[in-house]
């Protein structure tokens, strides 16, 4: 409710200021820092208030988890006081050295006083019981009431059970009541979009100054550039790159200093001379003789390489087994004899049927001439 009242008060004042600014006003001057200067001081104050930097105050950083735990936490029913000092056990192992200490003497005195007080209290209770038995009933009732009051006073020292447990519905209602009021269109119009971020930073404590560190510029990587590669300086021309070549396997070819046009012309003339000399060859010319002699030599060398003798291959110079050479010569002669004998008529006599080619042909002719004669009979003969 308080928040609503404050907002209504501010809204009323803002409405009045807007009404004042709507009418015609006298302007005395302009400036880059302050802007327009009005003659009326109240209007000038309203204008400066609008030009002031906007601030969006942010709520404190509250830990809502801890807040929720504290809300739904159950406290202990009783808190028992711990003894100041635990009694020392009588058993001590190892080397025992008695040291006179003031604390031990104080403990003995405290224990003696406590024992005396307990004995006195017990004696009082016993005497009271004995005396109450002697007293009349009315007096005994009054004494019992007094004893009950004393017991209740002693029990007041104990902490009562204080459960701070809240239902989910109550907690939800409380959170809704603590929520701020929703923003209106008027609130959005007061803070422009371009000033929203700066207003939030001012609410967090920003003083409006930029940091001393230089901003990091994110440069986009060039296309088709591999990982770890560096782009070539675009300022250097191709000629500047070739002046200072790096030590690499590739060696650029430098152009000749002479004029390329003259060189090409000289080459053309030389080629033309050669072509003319080849066309004008005659059997009597020396060039023709040289060419023919070279051709004959090359032809003879090719023929001799195809038909080399056994001795020309230098097989006899090698250390070979003489029996192997004899065996090779014997079989070579036998193959030659076989080639000459296979075309004679007596070569296939006495061999198997697979070699009787000539007899097979003759049998075919006999079948045509004498059909009554069987082909198998001729085969078996």
Curated annotation (Swiss-Prot):
Keyword terms, alphabetized: Coiled coil, mRNA processing, mRNA splicing, Nucleus, Phosphoprotein, Spliceosome
Compositionally biased residues, Polar residues: 274-285
Pfam families, per the entry: G-patch_2
UniProt region (Disordered), positions on chain: 1-21, 262-381
InterPro entries for this protein: Spp2-like, Spp2/MOS2_G-patch
Gene Ontology annotations of biological process type: mRNA splicing, via spliceosome
First-listed, main subcellular location of the protein, grouped into a coarse class: nucleus
Entry keyword Membrane: no
Disulfide bridge map: none
GO cellular component: mitotic spindle; nucleus; spliceosomal complex
Segments forming a coiled coil: 104-157
Family: Belongs to the SPP2 family.
Subunit structure, as described in the record: Belongs to the 40S cdc5-associated complex (or cwf complex), a spliceosome sub-complex reminiscent of a late-stage spliceosome composed of the U2, U5 and U6 snRNAs and at least brr2, cdc5, cwf2/prp3, cwf3/syf1, cwf4/syf3, cwf5/ecm2, spp42/cwf6, cwf7/spf27, cwf8, cwf9, cwf10, cwf11, cwf12, prp45/cwf13, cwf14, cwf15, cwf16, cwf17, cwf18, cwf19, cwf20, cwf21, cwf22, cwf23, cwf24, cwf25, cwf26, cyp7/cwf27, cwf28, cwf29/ist3, lea1, msl1, prp5/cwf1, prp10, prp12/sap130, prp17, prp22, sap61, sap62, sap114, sap145, slu7, smb1, smd1, smd3, smf1, smg1 and syf2.
Function: Involved in spliceosome maturation and the first step of pre-mRNA splicing.
Protein name, per record: Pre-mRNA-splicing factor cwf28
Organism, as annotated: Schizosaccharomyces pombe (strain 972 / ATCC 24843)
Lineage of source species: Eukaryota, Fungi, Dikarya, Ascomycota, Taphrinomycotina
